[in-house]
Amino acid sequence: MKSKALLCINTLKSGAGILGDDIKVYLETKHFVEVVLIDVSKPLLSFPRENFLFLITLGGDGTVLLAVNLLLENKNVDIPIISINMGKVGFLADIKIEDFKKVIDRFFKNSLVINKKFLLHVTVYKHGKDLISRYALNDIIIRSSLLNKMIHVDLKVNSENFLSYKSDGIIVSTPTGSTGYSFSAGGPILEAELEGFLLTPISPHSVYNRSFVFSKLSKLSLSFSKEYFIAPASIFLDGINFGSFGVDVVFEFEISSQSLNFVSFCTDTFVKRLKNKLL
């Protein structure tokens, strides 16, 4: 049976379609691999039920997150991910376009480094019943469903009361996602290998206006303060809205034992990458 690879492209990126065709031809002619193509900028009717050798993403970090969401939805987390950057920053998509042939060739020679990126898990409860149980690679955001309205939430750490936040929202982020929205909201950048996660309030109106970093053993619980509840809040996982919830729900966060396998081709140090991409 012929081996297969999954190619996820974002055709909204200029040149993505042409480069996708080049990658497809290269895989099929040199490595005799059949390519299944998905355009993540369009609605997907069904996910292909195949055993893929690897996944290639072609776009920016947003394309990677959309492709990862497809893998998580279909419980296909073991597949190696080759992320080719056609965006600007490219923390997740860090392989240069001109290197795609080298990366593919080295994959078949088993001479590439695989970096494991762990996932953040959230469970949404209401009266003890699970409403949502999902994973995110970058971050999970809770904010008011109404424009210009704040949320009031109470935070527990390992079932112990800790803080109350009055803010525009709350970001819970992995180290991988710490360079994204959390960083823009004033949070710290964590090295991707750090085994922990962080919570950052968005525009807080409280004394506690700093981020907190927690170990992988910690479990966080957020609930709405009934006294100050104004409107339902929406939850976003890696930028995707998974619904709005009212006063009686509890959001529980923890680091998952599951991880994703990202192919690494970058030899730059963590510090050098930050300087090149952020400064």
Curated annotation (Swiss-Prot):
Keywords: ATP-binding, Cytoplasm, Kinase, NAD, NADP, Nucleotide-binding, Transferase. It is found in: Cytoplasm. One of its GO terms (cellular component) is cytoplasm. Its cofactor is a divalent metal cation. Its EC number is 2.7.1.23. NAD(+) binds at residues 61-62, 138-139, 149, 166, 168, 179-184. It is an enzyme of class 2 (transferase). Gene3D superfamilies: Probable inorganic polyphosphate/atp-NAD kinase, domain 1, Probable inorganic polyphosphate/atp-NAD kinase, domain 2. One of its GO terms (biological process) is NAD metabolic process. It catalyses: NAD(+) + ATP = ADP + NADP(+) + H(+). One of its GO terms (molecular function) is metal ion binding. Its main location: cytoplasm. The active site is at residue 61. It comes from the Bacteria. Belongs to the NAD kinase family. Involved in the regulation of the intracellular balance of NAD and NADP, and is a key enzyme in the biosynthesis of NADP. Catalyzes specifically the phosphorylation on 2'-hydroxyl of the adenosine moiety of NAD to yield NADP. This is NAD kinase. The lineage of its organism: Bacteria, Pseudomonadati, Spirochaetota, Spirochaetia, Spirochaetales.
